[in-house]
Amino acid sequence: MTQVYDITIIGGGPVGLFAAFYAHLRQAKVKIIDSLPQLGGQPAILYPEKAILDIPAFPSLTGQELTDNLLAQLAPFDTTICLNETLTAIEPGETITLTTNKGNHQTKTLIIAMGGGAFKPRPLEIDGADSFDNVHYHVSNIQQYADKDIVVLGGGDSAVDWSLAFEKIAKTTQIIHRRDNFRALEHSVEELKQSSVTIHTPFIPKGLSGENGRASAIDFDKVKSEDKLTLSFDHLFVNYGFKSSVGTLKEWGLELNRHRIVVNSKQETSVPGIYAIGDCCFYEGKIDLIATGLGEAPTAVNNAMNYLNPNEKVQPKHSTSL
């Protein structure tokens, strides 16, 4: 017979992991379902060595350190974890039935913490770019790029942050953006301008050259100009953001705003017993930060527990009193 859980969480990224931990503090029986082969979400898989600067009480920590800390926090509790499972359907009711690519699950309440859904890097759209093994979309071991010539493409937080990280160990670091202004946090952009990183704007990549499976140079055209630019490198890093897919989200019967799940101040969706937190949810004024999602997790858990036990207060004891 299928076991029925108090709270099932869809998504094993930072927000989902913290929601699971907090649910255990409320003595809930918890399950996590994630489509990836490991827990941790984007920070663990796509930028394990990238510094994250907006987690309270941590001046800086990497994606892997954040994941390790969250897993250590969760470790003392008995959490059922299902990996490589993708949610395909939700059947609401007193007991909610979840259908995945591997079977069915039953739960009393559901917290969706799936981020932007399945994700993959936006590719460098140059013929043959995927044939070179030194064209990268994420960093798994930054020390292997010490004393190398590095070129970074992009203008957002990842591109700027990685450029600043490479500056500390690389022989040379250059960043190229298609616009004059960067989209990264103002403090990071100012730090970039004060660094030894060479900045080229606004340029659009046009071609790669190399041999034996390794690229050695990239050509650019300057926007609204006849100027050309060619840069040689040992490694090229593409930071154009990510494409995400929400799969069958539209078929789950939840109110959506574009591709996000509409929630109220209790993190409740339009379906009783189902909550959404993190980047997958929408409300007016929503800010997409890990820190924001971490704050939404206790709200969802406490209201889920109140849904299960209407006579109990939504506001629980503080952890300092446990």
Curated annotation (Swiss-Prot):
Keywords from the named record: FAD, Flavoprotein, NADP, Oxidoreductase
GO molecular function, a single term: NADP binding
PANTHER family: THIOREDOXIN REDUCTASE 1-RELATED-RELATED
EC number of this enzyme: 1.18.1.2
Similarity annotation: Belongs to the ferredoxin--NADP reductase type 2 family.
Cofactor binding summary note: Binds 1 FAD per subunit.
Gene3D superfamilies associated with the record: FAD/NAD(P)-binding domain
Catalytic class of the enzyme: oxidoreductase
Keyword Acetylation assigned: no
Co-factor(s): FAD
Catalytic activities: 2 reduced [2Fe-2S]-[ferredoxin] + NADP(+) + H(+) = 2 oxidized [2Fe-2S]-[ferredoxin] + NADPH
HAMAP family: FENR2
Name of this chain's protein: Ferredoxin--NADP reductase
Subunit record text: Homodimer.
Residues that coordinate or bind FAD: 34, 42, 47, 87, 119, 279, 320
